[in-house]
């Protein structure tokens, strides 16, 4: 478990990289391996405000092609900036797939590393977040985004 300001996080990895970040209350099989100390170091630095980009390898094995495309595009959104579900849909070449993009964000296995907290609704409202709206608000404020 990683103690973060938004609650305890369980970090799961494969030989290829981090596979999942789980918020408190989410269940995982017991035999899933924990992530390396480098992963926790980078998260510690992120929450301390000294890291703006993650360098640890990520493993999206098992994610559908469309969702992986959305997540790869989302990973490009820089620290301190936001995008919208509609902008992401356009960026992956499917401007009518706004709801599918929302679903991809909601099921993002790697929140924080792939920053779904930086996605807002088109009206500027926060929208949902798997870790809770309060956590999303905290992360955005921490990154200097006034929402």
Residue ranges and their predicted role:
Residues 98-108:
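Regulatory, non-catalytic segments
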Residues 95-98, 139:
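LysM (lysin motif) carbohydrate-binding repeats in extracellular/periplasmic proteins that recognize
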Residues 56-60, 101, 126-129:
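Short clusters of hydrophobic/aromatic residues that line enzyme substrate/ligand-binding pockets
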Residues 122-147:
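…primarily DNA-binding HTH/wHTH and HhH modules…
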Residues 1-96, 144-147:
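Basic nucleic-acid-binding alpha-helical/helix-turn surface characteristic of O6-alkylguanine DNA
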Residues 112-119:
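Short Lys/Arg-enriched helix C-cap and helix-to-coil transition segments
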């Amino acid at each position: 478990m990683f103690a973060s300001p938004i609650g305890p996080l369980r970090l799961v990895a494969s030989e290829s990289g981090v596979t999942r970040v789980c918020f408190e209350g989410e269940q995982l099989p017991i035999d899933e391996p924990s992530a390396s100390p480098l992963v926790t170091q980078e998260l510690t630095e992120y929450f301390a405000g000294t890291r703006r980009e993650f360098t640890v390898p990520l493993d999206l094995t098992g994610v559908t092609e469309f969702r992986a495309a959305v997540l790869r595009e989302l990973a490009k959104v820089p620290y301190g900036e936001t995008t919208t579900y509609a902008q992401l849909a356009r960026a992956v070449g499917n401007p009518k797939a706004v709801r599918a993009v929302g679903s991809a964000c909601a099921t993002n296995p790697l929140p924080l590393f792939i920053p779904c907290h930086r996605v807002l609704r088109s009206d500027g409202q926060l929208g949902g977040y798997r870790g809770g709206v309060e956590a999303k608000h905290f992360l955005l404020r921490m990154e200097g985004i006034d929402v």
